[in-house]
Amino acid sequence: MKQNVNVLLIVCDQFRGDALSFANHPDVKTPYLDSLAADGVFFSHAYSATPSCIPARAALMTGRSQKRHGRVGYLDEVEWRYQHYMAEEFSNSGY
């Protein structure tokens, strides 16, 4: 039986990608994230589907573009009902 690899997705709000001590930030100390990065994958050039956090998280969790998921903010009256969610896809893959 194939063993699934461990996946840890950290989603932060209002987080600068350079605010990490392992990314040589002069003041910020992030020892736990440093430890994770040493044994994992760090995407130094990752890009977001949209520039604001709510539609970007919706795109990440549903696999749909902002145009397709319709999410703009919390008060946009768009239902949070989509065909697929990342958690569901992980579950379907044995996680």
Where are these regions (language model features)?
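Formylglycine-dependent sulfatase
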Residues: 1-95
